[in-house]
């Protein structure tokens, strides 16, 4: 299977709240071949505002592309593993979410899309994988918000997961990330229209401004300083990328996905984990800053664990930019 994004119906899905989503569609990419016994799969999870194209060399995500880590002989070895990356439930890149059509109305779900949890996101991923024939995961791994999913997986499906890796991530949701805070920021915009902005052309300017702020916070400007000496050229490139994202992402997804992570906290459940654990943090990272107490907690877990602190000027972007420094860690997670 190649780099094209595919879409698969997994049927109706009942959320943790008890509400039922009809005919959930899941967008995903897959690389490599699934073994006859279905046990050679690896799930790569994506971040808060990105999607399955994080594995594409031409894609720019907030956490950086993982394309250099994917391929024959690389840590995400397509000769050995069946690599899947699916768009999260509630996101904006092909999976059922606020920008997809509500069958009951024929219109985008918009603000009527139900609240979801991280367990729902992982549950939909599980349904996709089992529909594809996967019976076991050699690893679940991803950066930032994706690392929270990777931690949730061995708690929710302990018998299915061999290893879990969280890169530039944490054991709780990011401080300050909440559905209420995101909704309040968006509601201040004249593009909001009471949340019914789909009928008014969306929120392109608001999302563009938010994306510019986010990418600067993540360290993208620092990266571009090393690549482009001309400040005007750097700003133009940053603006183009942020404008492109703003044209494709749905503002309601910011609210839905923030809400999904609010209750995430595995600090008191580390003793339940039986999967091999990798935890990589970066200094400095304004989103998930390293914390000695978290490092001690990870290292004290009962399965084999590896806690690594990278010193990088690229902050939260180190997940993709510093991919060479991640190679050894991912090979530990996925040993030959």
Predicted regions and their residues:
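Conserved acidic catalytic loop of the alpha/beta-hydrolase fold
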Residues: 106-108, 112, 119-138
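Alpha/beta-hydrolase-fold enzymes
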Residues: 160-243
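Catalytic active-site module of serine/aspartate enzymes centered on a nucleophile-bearing elbow/loop
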Residues: 304-336
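Conserved hydrolase catalytic core segment
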Residues: 136-176
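Short beta-strand/loop motif that positions the catalytic acidic residue
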Residues: 273, 279-281
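N-terminal cap/lid subdomain of alpha/beta-hydrolase-fold enzymes
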Residues: 29, 38-102
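Catalytic-loop region of hydrolases
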Residues: 1-44, 58
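Conserved alpha/beta-hydrolase "acid-adjacent" motif
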Residues: 286-292
